[in-house]
UniProtKB/Swiss-Prot annotation:
Organism: Saccharomyces cerevisiae (strain ATCC 204508 / S288c)
Residues that bind ATP: 920-927
Region span, Disordered: 1-38, 829-873
Positions on the Extracellular side per record topology: 553-567, 639-642, 721-783, 1241-1312, 1362-1368, 1418-1492
Source organism phylogeny: Eukaryota, Fungi, Dikarya, Ascomycota, Saccharomycotina
Keyword Transport part of the UniProt annotation: yes
Keywords for the protein's UniProt record, in alphabetical order: ATP-binding, Glycoprotein, Membrane, Nucleotide-binding, Repeat, Transmembrane, Transmembrane helix, Transport
Domain ABC transporter residues, every copy: 171-420, 884-1127
The protein, known as: ATP-dependent permease PDR15
Compositionally skewed regions (Basic and acidic residues) per UniProt: 1-13, 829-840
């Protein structure tokens, strides 16, 4: 991870001619044995400054323009003029041919020195203080305390209790907050940090470190700071900082959130642009300045080689995790904040790289007079020595604040003992841990009382001289905070601001520049992910061809028979254009965390980002619109007129932007994606139904007509229809009456059958059709355009406002979650407090253990295990005598052009009862070795031999080991005990009884000390187990499997605080003491942690062994080995791990004096290892037994038992996931209520029948929302299975997949039943069935179809996600297939009018059979009752009754009826007499109902079978995979 930093530092080291300096930064950095950013001697720095100020072109440019330039930061002056003889930036920095060039200032030079660069910039600024206005910022806080809302110990939400739980929370919100409902996160504390100082904050998770950093960085969102607290920044208040100077005080959270598709350079360059000051170096323009600062930041933090590499994330491949962390650090460094708060910024970095980061901060502080506060969990001694001050916290109490060099003595004087080789930081943190701190023997012998609780230690602090001195410093600093100090900061900030930037704004560049730079960034993103836009255009073009060609045949007639289909095609067009932007909500939530972070850095307004995103999305939207609409318009054969087409295109573009801005508003108004999808889905349904096609405006029920009036698409659809039909005369396609008996009739004796026809006319005017059918008038054509534009503008500004002012979800403190039944039991037993104090905000760390816990001492190996003998009695952990050993292990992976060796002839063994550490530099192959030994690599070639008691590994091996991954992966809804039992049930042999497995689980809980939270739910960060508890559970899950051979642990202490790391090592030590064999990778542990291990296997770069052997007491055996091979002496107080890394050249700035792999292979120790391996291979096979047939099985449990247990667990998870289930049911209820009451009790008129048909069509649109909710749930299950449970052989893929099928079905049956009960009766289908005398059969079959449809949604979702990695991709594919199935189901275009080519799509669409059956079940076998406007009116021949006149026609047509057959003046004729005739026009028939049901069930079965096959094909490892093992003879 830090190799690139090391390369830079090595070059700097070689170029450095002096190692001492009177400069404070140089003095601090020069104290360490291996140095990173080497300092220059004071004389060299001053000489460099003189050279730059006398010879540089900057100075010349300044001199030449002195007459015309002035120092007002906001005048048009020469500093913005870009000199034509500069290459990007002044040649002093970048052009080697320029006189005075210094390579130490050139970030592209191998000799670049960040210290020299910072010093040079400081010299430039101080050379002209009136222009550059240098300033600094410190912070003092007095009586600072913070509080948050108290949280009950929560109970697990379930499907049954979530509603009363939410109601209870709602009632609490209505009540005024009481004092007992809050708790103090921070007790009153004080501090003073002056410019140029570094402060380290130490404390365990939950002690208040994060809250302190947020409080002093004016970032108190989520908690409250007491009114009497004083926080002052040179006289500025927290409110001043938030409103006007937010960018001067920055809080950096530990998470690394970036736009994954941007390169490292683009990410940092955007930040540099936003922070380029107006009063920058004279003669350098903005772009050159930003570019140079970006290159300096990349060179400083070892990122230059990643310049054009994507930053990436968990899903997008990019830079490594450590490099991503450095990008985050560089981002803050470019911001140039004068006061910086770093919250666990070194997490994910090894100690060497973390040290380089602290040194960079020290350089900035010493030279640039910045102030920085760093909360750090594991801090080496070298890093600690760089800090000026330290603050120690415990349980919200301040235990110490003062000089870092005095802290150790302070606590020793208090009565605590610091063991040898323990770092000062670890010692200070251990004071807060009852199980780790050691009371000095001298105090014990004298009987002196030593403060032990946080409150006692805080009181001791308040009585100390150090506290009195601190108060004096604070008071003195507050007195200096005058108006003059505030004016200096105000003037400096104003000088940095660009023209037209409001003086009160915290931003450096103005709003227009922000939008400009963000536009460029967005276009970079689009270029990096151009394939997404390309596929969107291609996909929409294909859909245009498909949908357009569907109407191609019927539209060619251009007569009245096309009326319905023209409306349907127009409806399709506007919906497709409008809803093409629905999935923009996903991208909003992808970028929101970045925007919120940049807002706190004061880079840009969130609304500027929103503005830029809208502008940058215009080109792809317009391209997509052009491709779709040109193809669709001309394929459908809409009106061929240039003006008409462009109006059509204009309206559809407006529809696109209207709905785009509306969905963006929804996304900005909500705080999570889940919150946004529900209202978005509801809006989609409402807008679709009330556009005016599914149910015309004149037919909308009175209670819901307001929805039409506020629906923007209603007006746009009206304009489109007017545009298509106005001033057109459509020839009549069918007359009434017609036939052989009516050849000679003329005039008013016949009429066209289309709506809007007049007797005697052989055509229908388009305007008449629109007026009669939709109540549309031509004068409203441009009204729709105007209203649409108004909506676009309105939603756009609402979107900007919401983005600017909508804050993210507040962070919550941590709480433990139990099952509700268990909470009642615990409260009854008195084991649970009524109130539980949440832990540290933001980091979601666990609250501190009870400070009254019995004091324990650190024990050496001979007395390991702090449990009493009674505690250890009866422990039944699996013990094994088998020895695991390997020899000449090599691992090669294919790369471009050949093979790359990762492991090179590694030997070793792990014996029962021993704890072996696997160490090495970053990239040495530690985790790879662990994976090879555990059979977890998925590609490459393994050579060498891996034995168990002298026998090569066999099929029983994977079941005989436990593997604890670095990530703590668990099912969040299970309790601790349930997780352990699940592992025991499925991984222990089936011959072991359930009772015995349960007893063994209890033993595991006991030895891991998890009794207090054994019934707690695993949960998620902040609401469940904390970091340490999760790590214990990870180990427990593997122990519950009763591995008879050994346990592998990968980086069990990575990312943990020192106390939790110590507890984890103590736990491993305890397991080894009880006979467990353990092999553990660990990254540069502290000296105290190193003493817990028995043996060490150390690898260097290239996977080569440097040492394998005993560590000895105090690591003496290992130290003696290296010293005997020529290494320099290990200082008595040094960390042996860091000393060893330095010796072998694995630490930054260090160089090995010899090849220690060669030294090892030529050593006596190596020969002893080989002899031991020879003995093992010769003698161990005879004492071991051959694995039984049972042990050779891939899984301990049968497939049936696996399926049973996994299904039970999954049912349990669904029950405990109310968000997913209630979202499904709420969407179902809303959709069906909305549809049902929109078409409430539809009558049997022609319009009523069409409404009932379209209601069935709309009934299916719930497919997409339900599908999109299901996919993430499956992905979570699959990730857990594939990452942990499949490699550990817990259960097979078939049991996993079948359980996914089975468990989803009952909930879909329930959802389908709910939908049926609401929809079927609300629309009025039951009335039709009752009138036909078929109430029970039709109702039952309709119900079966309803539940089958919801099961079909689940089957399609499973099919889509079975082979897709990402839920979004599966959702896109599912939506596309559903759209095609719905388009060809026969509703919008009947099979009679479809081109012959598409008939096969009609037949393969599963919705064809469902909608055919539902329509028949809903309306078949009853009479039609036309409304008055649907009756065709004409006059019969004189002297003839209507009945006689129409008899021949009715007989020929087979349908139709007269309202009054005896009438002789006006005949009122309805063209359809029965609903069966209506069904026939859509090729629907009642007799096919059961056949259609059977076919639809076959589709569901096919989906499940295909999904199972595709999952096996794409995701199940095959035995003939990419991994090959070649044992050596």
């Amino acid at each position: 991870m830090s190799s690139d930093i090391r390369d830079v530092e090595e070059r700097n080291s070689r170029s450095s001619s002096s190692s001492s300096s009177s400069n404070s930064a140089a003095q601090s950095i020069g104290q360490h044995p291996y140095r990173g950013f080497d300092s220059e001697a004071a004389e060299r720095v001053h000489e460099l400054a003189r050279t730059l100020t006398s010879q540089s072109l900057l100075y010349t440019a300044n001199s030449n323009n002195s007459s015309s330039s002035n120092h007002n930061a906001h005048n048009a002056d020469s500093r913005s003029v870009f000199s034509t003889d500069m290459e990007g930036v002044n040649p002093v920095f970048t052009n080697p041919d320029t006189p005075g060039y210094n390579p130490k200032l050139d970030p592209n030079s191998d000799q670049f020195s960040s210290t020299a660069w910072v010093q040079n910039m400081a010299n430039i600024c101080t050379s002209d203080p009136d222009f550059y206005k240098p300033y600094s910022l410190g912070c003092v806080w007095k009586n600072l305390s913070a509080s948050g809302d108290s949280a009950d110990v929560s109970y697990q939400s379930t499907f049954a209790n979530i509603v009363p739980k939410l109601l209870t929370k709602g009632l609490r919100l209505l009540k005024p907050s009481k004092e007992e409902d809050t708790f103090q996160i921070l007790k009153p504390m004080d501090g003073c940090l002056n410019p140029g100082e570094l402060l380290v904050v130490l404390g365990r998770p939950g002690s208040g470190c994060t809250t302190l950093l947020k409080s002093i960085s004016s970032n108190s969102h989520g908690f409250k700071i007491a009114k009497d607290s004083i926080v002052s920044y040179n006289g500025l208040s927290s409110s001043d900082i938030r409103k006007h100077y937010r960018g001067e005080v920055v809080y950096n959270a530990e998470s690394d959130i970036h736009l994954p598709h941007l390169t490292v350079y683009q990410t940092l360059f955007t930040v540099a642009r936003m922070k380029t000051p107006q009063n920058r170096i004279k003669g350098v323009d903005r772009e050159a300045y930003a570019n140079h600062v970006t290159e300096v930041a990349m060179a400083t933090y070892g990122l230059s080689h990643t310049r054009d590499t994507k930053v990436g994330n968990d899903l997008v491949r990019g830079v490594s995790g450590g490099e991503r962390k450095r990008v985050s650090i560089a981002e803050v460094a470019i911001c140039g904040a004068r006061f910086q708060c770093w919250d666990n910024a070194t997490r994910g970095l090894d100690s060497a790289t973390a040290l380089e980061f602290i040194r960079a901060l020290k350089t900035q502080a010493d030279i640039g007079k910045t102030a920085a506060t760093v909360a750090i969990y594991q801090c080496s001694q070298d890093a600690y020595d760089l800090f000026d001050k330290v603050c120690v916290l415990d349980d919200g109490y301040q235990l110490y604040f003062g000089p870092a060099k005095d802290a150790k003595k302070y606590f020793q004087d208090m009565g605590y003992y610091c063991p040898p080789r323990q770092t000062t930081a670890d010692f200070l943190t251990s004071i807060t841990s009852p199980t780790e701190r050691i009371i000095s023997k001298e105090f014990i012998e004298k009987g002196t009382r030593v403060p032990q609780t946080p409150k006692d230690m805080a009181e001791y602090w308040l009585q100390s001289e150090s506290y009195k001195n601190l108060i004096k410093d604070i008071d003195s600093t507050l007195e200096k905070n005058t108006d003059e100090a505030r004016n200096i900061i105000r003037d400096a900030h104003h000088a940095k601001q660009a023209k037209r930037a409001p003086p009160s704004s915290p931003y450096v560049v103005n709003y227009g520049m922000q939008v400009k730079y963000l536009l460029i960034r967005n276009f970079w993103r689009m270029k990096q992910s151009a394939s997404v836009t390309l596929w969107q255009v291609i996909g929409n073009s294909v859909m245009a061809f498909i949908l357009g060609s569907m109407f191609y045949k019927v539209m060619k007639k251009n007569d009245t028979s096309t009326f319905y289909f023209r409306g349907a095609a127009m409806f399709f067009a506007i919906l497709f254009n409008a809803f093409s932007c629905l999935l923009e909500i996903f991208s909003l939530y992808e970028t929101r965390p970045i925007t919120e972070k940049h807002r706190t850095y004061s880079l840009y307004h969130p609304s500027a980002d929103a503005f830029a995103s809208v502008l940058s999305e215009m080109p792809p939207k317009l391209i997509t619109a052009v491709c779709f609409n040109i193809i669709f318009y001309f394929l459908v054969d809409f009106r061929r007129n240039g003006g008409v087409f462009f109006f059509y295109f204009l309206i559809n573009v407006i529809a696109t932007f209207t709905l785009s801005h509306l969905f963006r508003c929804v996304g900005s108004l909500t705080k999570t994606l889940q919150e946004a999808m529900v209202p978005a889905s509801m809006l989609l349904l409402a807008i679709s139904m009330y556009t005016g096609f599914a149910i015309p405006k004149t037919k909308i029920l009175g209670w819901s007509i307001w929805i039409w009036y506020i629906n923007p698409l209603a007006y746009l659809f009206e304009s489109l229809m007017i545009n298509e039909f106005h001033d057109r005369r459509f020839p009549c396609a069918q007359y009434i009456p017609a036939g052989p008996a009516y050849q000679n009739i003329t005039g008013t004796q016949r009429v066209c059958s289309a709506v809007g026809a007049y007797p005697g006319n052989d055509y229908v005017l388009g305007d008449d059709f629109l007026k009669e059918s939709y109540d549309y008038e031509h004068k409203h054509k441009w009204r729709g355009f105007g209203i649409g534009m108004a909506y676009v503008v309105f939603f756009f500004f609402v979107y900007l406002i919401l983005c600017e002012y909508n804050e993210g979800a507040k962070q919550k403190g941590e709480m433990v979650v139990f099952l509700r039944s268990k909470i009642k039991q615990l409260k009854k037993e008195g084991k649970l407090q009524e109130k539980h104090r949440p832990g540290d905000i933001e980091n979601n760390a666990g609250s501190s253990p009870d400070s009254a816990t019995t004091e324990k001492k650190i024990l050496d190996d001979s007395s390991e295990g702090s449990d009493s003998s009674s505690d250890n009695a009866g422990l039944g952990l699996s013990k094994s005598e088998a020895i695991f050993h390997w020899r000449d292990l090599c691992y090669d992976v294919p790369i471009k052009g050949g093979q790359r060796r990762i492991l090179n002839n590694v030997d070793g063994w792990v014996k029962p009862g021993t704890l072996t550490a696997l160490m090495g530099a970053s990239g040495a192959g530690k985790t790879t070795l662990l994976d090879c030994l555990a059979e977890r690599v998925t590609m490459g070639v393994i050579t060498g031999n891996i034995f168990v008691d002298g026998r090569l590994r066999d099929e029983s091996f994977p079941r005989s080991i436990g593997y604890c991954q670095q990530q703590d992966l668990h099912l969040k809804t299970a309790t601790v005990r349930e997780s352990l039992r699940f592992s025991a049930y499925l991984r222990q042999p089936s011959s072991v009884s359930i009772e015995e497995k349960n007893r063994y689980v209890e033993e595991v809980i006991k030895i891991l000390e998890m009794q207090q939270y054994s019934d707690a739910v695993v949960g998620v960060a902040g609401e469940g187990l904390n970091v340490e508890q999760r790590k214990r559970l990870t180990i427990g899950v593997e122990l519950a499997a009763r591995p008879k051979l050994l346990v592998f642990l990968d980086e069990p202490t990575s990312g943990l605080d020192s106390q939790t790391a110590w507890d984890t090592c103590q736990l491993m030590r305890k397991l080894a003491t009880h006979g467990q064999a353990i092999l553990c990778t660990i990254h540069q542990p502290s000296a105290i942690l190193m003493q817990q291990f028995d043996r060490l296997l150390f690898l260097q770069k290239g996977g080569q062994t440097v040492y394998f052997g005993d560590l000895g007491e105090g690591c003496k055996t290992m130290i003696d080995y290296f010293e005997s091979k020529g290494a320099h002496k290990c200082p008595p107080d040094a960390n042996p791990a860091e000393w060893m890394l330095e010796v072998v050249g694995a630490a930054p700035g260090s160089h090995a004096t010899q090849d220690y792999n060669e030294v090892w292979r030529n050593s006596d120790e190596y020969k002893a290892v080989q002899e031991e391996l020879d003995w093992m291979e010769k003698n161990l096979p005879g004492r071991s037994k051959e694995p039984t047939a049972e042990e050779h099985k891939p899984f301990a449990a049968s497939l049936y038992y696996q399926f049973k247990m996994v299904t039970i667990r999954l049912f349990q998870q669904y029950w405990r996931s109310p968000d997913y289930l209630w979202s499904k049911f709420i969407l179902t209820i809303f959709n069906q209520v909305f549809i049902g009451f929109t078409f409430f009790k539809a009558d049997r008129s022609l319009q009523g029948l069409q409404n009932q048909m379209l209601s069935i069509f709309m009934y299916t649109v719930i497919f997409n929302p339900i599908l999109q909710q299901y996919l993430p749930s499956f992905v979570q299950q699959r990730d857990l299975y594939e990452a942990r449970e499949r490699p550990s052989r817990t259960f097979s893929w078939l049991a996993f997949f079948l359980s996914q099928i089975i468990v989803e079905i009952p909930w879909n049956i329930l959802a389908g039943t709910i939908a049926y009960c609401i929809y079927y009766y609300a629309v009025g289908f039951y009335a039709n069935a009752s009138a036909a005398g078929q109430l029970h059969e039709r109702g039952a079959l309709f119900w079966l179809f309803s539940i089958a449809f919801y099961v079909y949604i689940g089957s399609m979702g499973l099919l889509m996600i079975s082979f897709n990695e990402v839920a979004e991709t599966a959702a896109h594919m599912g939506t596309l297939l559903f759209t095609m199935a719905l388009s060809f189901c026969g509703v919008m275009a009947t099979p009679k009018v479809m081109p012959r080519f598409w008939i096969f799509m009609y037949r393969v669409s599963p919705l064809t059979y469902m909608i055919d059956a539902l329509l028949a079940l809903g309306v078949a076998n009853v009479d039609v009752k036309c409304s008055n406007y649907e009756m065709v009116k004409f006059t019969p021949p004189s002297g003839t009754t209507c009945g006689d006149y129409m008899a021949s026609y009715i007989k020929l047509a087979g349908t139709g009826y007269l309202s009054d057959p005896s009438a002789t003046d006006i005949c009122s004729f309805c063209a359809v007499s029965t609903t069966n005739a209506f069904l026939a026009t859509f090729s629907s028939h009642y007799y096919r109902r059961w056949r259609n049901y059977g076919i639809f069930i076959c589709y569901i079965a096919f989906d499940y079978i295909a999904a199972t096959f595709l999952y096996w094909l794409s995701r199940v490892p095959k035995k003939n995979g990419k991994i090959s093992e070649k044992p050596k003879k």
